Amino acid sequence: MSKRYQRSNTLLPSPVGAPFRLAVVQFTVPGAKNGGSDKGPDGNRVDSIPIANGVIHAGGACDLLKFDSGIGDADACVAAFDTAANQYDALIVRINPGQLSQGTPQGTQAAFDALMNMYIARGKLIWSSPKIQTQMGAKDALVHISKLNCGLEDTYAYYTEEELFVGFKKTCAFQPRVLKQNRGSAGEGIWLCWLWDKNSNTKVERYPATYLGEKVLKDNDYLKLMEMNDNHVEFHTVKEFMIFCVDGPTGQGAGSWKSTFPGEYLKGGKAAHGQLVDQRLLPRIDEGEVRILMAGDTCQMAIHKKPLGGGLSAVGGNSEYTYYRPTDAKYFGLVQKLYADIPKLLPSLELEGEPLPLLWTCDYIPKNPDTWPKGPYDRSCPDAETEYTVGEFNCSCVGISKFQAVCGGEKTLADVPDADYFDACELTDLMGIKAIEMLVKAKEDRAAKMLAEAVGCGCWVGPRGNPLMKVEVTENGCTCAVQ
């Protein structure tokens, strides 16, 4: 149990004179039980009260604030929300992606996102901003981070049919690959790809190219494909697979498919987030993924997700979980390398100036160093020398698993066992600390910018615009006269 705070299943009173006011933003889906599968019978996300209480524990004021879609059209709904939200210094948006398009006036999601972007432009902190969710959560983020510690250099993005056909035929002629669609969150449209000898019904051990670009695959070359949502296996020619990716299973020449998802991964083009990302298949993926759970710039937990039954997918219920502190030796080096990457992470994603998400995850896959003498398939590489590469970022309303267990039914936060409650509150309390830290830094940065501008023009500067000091810029430097 927490040594500092007693359990609270309801929102705590905010401290008097708190330096910052925050709100946890929620939305009730019209007609859905509890207002959505992420909520309890009180209509709140089960993690919303602990997140708000985490802010309160850290010294901030925090309320629960709901977006109401029943006021009128999208503009009217957003205007009413703006009136309520404008009083806060920061918003923690806990609305699942897509919920604002369920039973709402047309254009609600776009109008809400525009309001969040306007707040950000004015200096209000939003976790997570629409831009962060779109660009950090997109699969082509893996291309942008390819030169960081957490990236894989031979990572490519395809936005057109021509890019896909040319690129994949080149990469898969050299080594096994993983193709990842941009849409979906449970492994659908993520394909592991191996060359297969159809005549002998065996895996091809020696690929045609000895280096990338030496040779390319032909349309009739044969592939073994595994989809990560359920580990099912299919065999297709390169041409059939490419047609499925572009036109779906009914595309002319696509062959017969078992996948329950429709392909068409490039549909709508780049503007509609249609894309495929092509990465090297790391053979140690069967050891599972390592999820690094982050609050702002701090790791709260490392979670090893091991596939069950000899599978390769650690998605959802297909895996068993082992939890590690960030200081545990097994993943300490991984966490430290992530910390080293953080200052470069958002700039590499063209997100410089945006705040880090308040709650986000990185899913890592283990690999042997490229210089490992025994090659990528060897399993004798020790923990200290094992490298890790990011397979996915998630920053879109990340759930807190030990609270999620009571979502969607008749149970409430009070039904979460004490051990799970206090474990989960370690994360929500850290989120509160990080939220206040980021607000303090944002305030300091604004003050420094104002001072720099004042120095540049020789203005009077002081708290809240009070003329306490006159800064004069001369050839010999700056002089200050105190009022």
Where are these regions (language model features)?
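Short N-terminal or domain-adjacent regulatory/targeting segments
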Residues: S2-A18
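Structural motif
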Residues: A23, I92-R94, V178, V277
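Conserved N-proximal alpha/beta basic substrate-recognition cap immediately N-terminal to
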Residues: V29-G31, D38-A173, S185
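Nucleotide-activated donor-dependent transferases that construct or modify glycoconjugates
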Residues: V16-K39
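Phosphate-binding site of ATP-dependent enzymes
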Residues: E188, W194-E352, C362-S380
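A positional/structural detector of protein chain ends, strongest at the extreme C-terminus
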Residues: T479-Q483
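ATP-dependent carboxylate activation and anion-phosphoryl transfer catalytic cores
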Residues: S2-K3, S101-Q102, R284-E287, T298, ...
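Short, solvent-exposed loop/turn segments at secondary-structure junctions
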Residues: V29-P30, G70, P97-G98, Q133, ...
